[in-house]
């Protein structure tokens, strides 16, 4: 973990405060103000543990900035469970940002009818690839913004390792654990889009095995699945071995025995 982390701030309240949104009439704007205020007061950067700074309103694809790390964050909030797809802004702008060096990380927040935060997780920017951004149909000609193309974030495509919880089922997780989990997969940020795509796909296959130790033969069972995801690659088994080696070099896996791997965090 980065030595720059000197002191951890912990979440001390899960209550959203309606009074901070008293000047708003729109229900969505009220909720936006309440959740953004709560996040700014309670939540820290997962990379360094510092407080986040709020951007000016309506900035495309960014709501918060870490002054220390210079990382951008966007907040998506919802009453009730977070769905498998989350609406976002303009498709072209989203693709432009996630394929750039300043791609944002995303906070996904769920609150209940009493305005209490039930779940909050962050998905680091290095987990975002164009494959998990779905293009929506253009707005119809009679719409005010006719032809505008929005997008959805396919949260169902985000592996468990890319869902770093601060709050889960109303229980606050220690900030130290949040930062540790973030740094456990930070090696992805140094890879290009194609490399990240392969690594994330293989990591997702490992997660689907649902056990801390697994064999190379078990990973070969995903050969046809990975071939569908990467139709231009005709050497899937060697690619699986290569990705497992990358994950081992990054400290994500270790060798348990010949042909057998073990997750370093499970």
Annotate each predicted stretch with a short phrase:
Residues 32-42, 54-60:
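Short, flexible, mixed-charge glycine/proline-rich loop motifs
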Residues 71-103:
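Short metal-binding segments enriched for Cys and/or His
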Residues 194-213:
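Positively charged, polyanion-binding regions of nucleic-acid-associated proteins
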Residues 59-72:
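Cysteine-rich micro-motifs
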Residues 258-266:
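Short, cationic-aromatic polyanion-contact patches
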Residues 224-240:
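Short, positively charged loop/turn segments that connect secondary-structure elements
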């Amino acid at each position: 973990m980065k030595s720059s982390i000197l002191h951890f701030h912990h979440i001390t309240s899960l209550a959203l405060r309606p009074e901070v949104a008293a000047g708003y009439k729109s229900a969505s704007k009220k909720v936006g103000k309440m959740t953004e205020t709560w996040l700014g007061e309670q939540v820290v950067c997962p990379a360094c543990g510092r407080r986040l700074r709020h951007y000016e309103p309506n900035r495309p694809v960014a709501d918060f900035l870490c002054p220390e790390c210079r990382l951008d964050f966007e907040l998506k909030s919802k009453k009730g469970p977070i769905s498998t797809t989350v609406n976002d802004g303009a498709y072209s702008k989203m693709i432009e940002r996630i394929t750039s060096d300043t791609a944002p990380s995303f906070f996904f927040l769920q609150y209940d009818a009493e305005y209490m935060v039930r779940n909050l997780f962050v998905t680091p920017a290095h987990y975002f690839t164009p494959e998990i951004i779905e293009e929506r149909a253009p707005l119809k000609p009679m719409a005010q913004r006719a032809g505008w193309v929005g997008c959805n974030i396919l949260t169902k495509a985000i592996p468990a390792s890319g869902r770093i919880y601060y709050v889960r089922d109303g229980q606050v997780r220690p900030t130290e654990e949040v930062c540790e989990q973030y740094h456990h997969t930070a090696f992805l940020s140094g890879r290009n889009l194609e490399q990240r795509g392969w690594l994330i796909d293989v990591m997702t296959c490992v997660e689907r095995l649902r056990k801390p130790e697994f064999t190379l033969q078990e990973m070969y069972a995903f050969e046809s699945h990975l071939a569908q995801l990467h139709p231009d690659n005709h050497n899937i088994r060697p690619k699986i071995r290569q990705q497992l080696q990358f994950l081992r070099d990054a400290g994500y896996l270790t060798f348990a025995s010949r042909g057998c791997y073990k997750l370093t965090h499970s």
